[in-house]
Curated annotation (Swiss-Prot):
One of its GO terms (biological process) is isoleucine biosynthetic process. This is Dihydroxy-acid dehydratase. The lineage of its organism: Bacteria, Pseudomonadati, Pseudomonadota, Gammaproteobacteria, Enterobacterales. It catalyses: (2R)-2,3-dihydroxy-3-methylbutanoate = 3-methyl-2-oxobutanoate + H2O; (2R,3R)-2,3-dihydroxy-3-methylpentanoate = (S)-3-methyl-2-oxopentanoate + H2O. Homodimer.
Length: 612
């Protein structure tokens, strides 16, 4: 039977000094016989998805204490990708994921903590904490801050839903008046919470339900809704229960690595493909799997993408449905239910409640569940009021969306496509693979041939788009923006949003060794591996080359002869120490980013650090 990890600092005469310090934090003699449970919060006033988390950490702590544990809270950093977007701040976003994982490890191991509750929400925080949970493998419950309500604006007597991407797109649309820009800017992000579409944050928080480390509703109950309070209360109680199961009863069932198995990762990826989620989830699942010693690779993503149907189109792939509508249609378990009906899931995975997938579906499917208290959760609706207060409203939908033919969630026979919302492409331009969110690609662009226009930074590409240097049929290449080459693998939301504002998004492609925001749509292909800085072929593309993209056949090809390719490789290597670096880019790279670039791998490995 394992001893409390915390006994290292709370038991024995040699730990008198440590106990003295624990007492100075408010602990009593009785507390030294209880589990010490960390509340790993990510509250910050910089991020709307985290602005409301300060009091939520205290709420979880209250229920840990009342359930028999000792609660100790600490914070991680949290970067807002939307605010960091479009300038050098985006270089820090992806590296912050690994920094968060490290900081959690440092705090947990330095203080010999027994278990933890992770309060996350936005893009890199959930995956960073997941990496830490699988690395540490101590009892853990995840609970996120919840999604933002969608923005609303009335134009020509018609209410239109908005999100962050609308504000970005409108801001550079030459047809937008100053008044329109101001109105959309004020309306796009009305409440606390993670941005209202199926962007990276909400995708990851939904995937945590499928992996099994969070509670039902984690990814979809609005941050403002009173129903979300129950998740934090339950998390505080549950973590004490599963902690005691491990330390008192020697039950390892609920340890993160026993919950987040390869089958659970496959179910999570299937969910992401079916709901047309962010491509960043591929990066994060690969990284988390590595931390948990789970054999989940790009090959698994590729195989799943060929058989999992695309059952949802949510913002940014449509203007009609946001997370609040997805929740009304049954949320995560609504999609999993449809996949399960056609035997596309591993059914014996289980979650921190101790229930396997089929048991969860029987309780949480709005089509078959008969527990009125559970089904009531899915009636949780937006209030339409601007606020940064959690649990501040209790609005309900009059009915649920159970239309599986034309509704927010489709059944298999009504799917938008039968081969999924995310695809892995291979070819001479991406020997180790690349990712495209097919849910955001217009049908006419599934097969595309265009002429390359090459840029060696996101800034250079943005300048070209806004100054009318891009024409229909172009394939914009943005290289040396990968994990090593950036460094930091910037998101490319601005280039894709600007293409949209210039009405070129249906007539151009964008290819990069960087990545895309969950808010990206259009023919946007990222995660090119190997990246340019790792001697990837993308480094050899020249303006005027033709690029062939064939999504149905999962191919991406630079159309030059083998002899020409070999000549370009030779010419690049002849540059000596400057080979496979940008030829003219000026960028300040700090020591922190240089250290990251020394160890980071390409995207097909999850952009994790290679330190083994």
């Amino acid at each position: 039977m394992p001893k409390y990890r915390s006994s290292t600092t709370t038991q024995g005469p040699n730990m008198s000094g440590a106990r003295a310090l624990w007492r100075a934090t408010g602990m009593s003699s009785d507390d030294f016989n209880k589990p010490i449970i960390a509340v790993v919060n990510s509250f910050t006033e910089f991020v709307p998805g985290h602005i409301h988390l300060r009091e939520l950490g205290q709420l979880v702590s209250q229920y840990i204490i009342s359930s028999g544990g000792v609660s100790k809270e600490f914070n991680t950093i949290a970067i807002d990708d939307g605010i960091a977007m479009g300038h050098s701040g985006m270089l820090y976003s992806l590296p912050s994921r690994d920094l968060i994982a490290d900081s959690v490890e440092f705090m947990i191991n330095a203080h010999c903590v027994d278990a933890m509750v992770c309060i996350s929400n936005c893009d890199k925080i959930t995956p960073g904490m997941l990496m830490a949970a699988l690395r540490l493998n101590i009892p853990c419950v995840f609970v996120s801050g919840g999604p933002m309500e969608s923005g609303k604006i009335v134009i020509s007597d018609k209410e239109i839903k908005l999100n962050l991407v609308d504000a970005i797109t409108c801001g550079v649309n030459p047809d937008s008046s100053d008044d329109m820009i101001n109105e959309i800017e004020k309306s796009a992000c009305p409440t606390c919470g993670s941005c209202s579409g199926m962007f990276t944050a909400n995708s990851m928080n939904c995937l945590m339900e499928a992996i099994g480390l969070s509670l039902p509703g984690n990814g979809t109950i609005l941050a403002t809704h009173i129903d979300r309070k129950k998740l934090f209360v339950q998390a505080g109680k549950l973590i004490v229960k599963i902690t005691q199961e491990y330390y008192k009863n020697n039950n390892e069932k609920f340890l993160p690595r026993n919950v987040a198995t390869k089958e659970a990762f496959c179910n999570a990826m299937a969910l992401d493909i079916a709901m047309g989620g962010s491509t960043n989830t591929v990066l994060h699942l690969l990284a988390a799997a590595r931390e948990g010693c789970v054999d989940f690779t790009m090959l698994d993503v590729d195989l799943l993408s060929r058989k999992i149907p695309n059952l949802c189109k949510l913002s940014p792939n449509t203007t009609f449905y946001h997370i609040e509508d997805f929740h009304r249609a049954g949320g995560v378990f609504g999609v999993l239910d449809e996949l399960n009906k056609v035997n596309l899931l591993y059914k014996q995975t289980f979650n921190i409640l101790g229930l396997n997938l089929e048991e969860m579906l029987s309780k949480y499917s709005i089509l078959t569940g008969n527990d009125k208290n559970i089904i009531k959760m899915f009636y949780a609706a937006p209030s339409g009021q601007k606020t940064i207060k959690p649990f501040s409203q209790s609005c309900r939908w009059n009915s649920l969306d159970i239309d599986r033919k034309l509704g927010c969630i489709r059944d298999y026979n009504s799917a938008f496509s039968l081969d999924g919302g995310i695809a892995v492409l291979y070819g001479n331009l991406a020997k180790d693979g690349c990712i495209v969110k097919t849910a955001g690609v217009h049908e006419k662009n599934l097969i595309f041939r265009g002429k390359a226009v090459v840029y060696e930074s996101q800034d250079e590409a943005v300048h070209a788009i806004l100054n009318n240097k891009i024409v229909k049929g172009n394939v914009i290449i943005i290289r040396y923006e990968g994990p090593k080459g950036g460094p930091g693998m910037q998101e490319m939301l601005y280039p894709t949003s600007y293409l949209k504002s210039m009405k070129l998004d249906q007539d151009c492609a964008l290819i990069t060794d960087g990545r895309f925001s969950g808010g990206t749509s259009g023919l946007s292909i990222g995660h090119i591996s190997p990246e340019a800085a790792n001697q990837g072929i993308i480094a050899l593309v020249r303006t005027g080359d033709f690029i062939d993209i064939n999504i149905p056949n999962r191919k991406i090809h630079l159309d030059i002869t083998d002899n020409e390719l070999l000549l370009r490789i030779k010419n690049e290597k002849d540059r000596g120490i400057d080979a496979y670096t940008p030829s003219h880019r000026k960028r300040i790279v700090t020591s922190a980013l240089k250290l990251y670039s020394k160890f980071v791998t390409s995207a097909d490995k999850g952009a994790v650090r290679n330190i083994r």
